[in-house]
C-alpha cells in the first residue's frame, strides 16, 4: 500500500520510538519519491497553539494527540509501516491553516 495525503501512518525508525505521522505531500508525488513530507504527532507538551492540530478517537486515533506543524520533515517512505487512519477534509483544512502559520505563508 502506498501512503497518500491525509493518511496517518506509523513511522518506525531504528532505535527510536515508533510514532504516527500525517502524510502531507500531495498523493501524486508520493509514488515517485523515496522521502515524503510528513507531520509528526505528540502526546507530550500538547498546547492549543496555531501550529498544533488536535486529533483524537473521532479521527481514528487510539488516543488524543497533536499534529505539530512546526516539526514537519521528510520521512523515508519505507519506514511508514502501516496506515492508522485517514483524516477528513475539515481536519485537513485545519492542517493547511496551521502549516500556513508555521511557514509564515498566510
Where are the model-predicted features located?
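Short linear motifs in intrinsically disordered
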Residues: 1-2, 44
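C-terminal terminal-subdomain/extension
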Residues: 1, 57-106
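Compact nucleic-acid interaction/catalytic patches
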Residues: 17-57
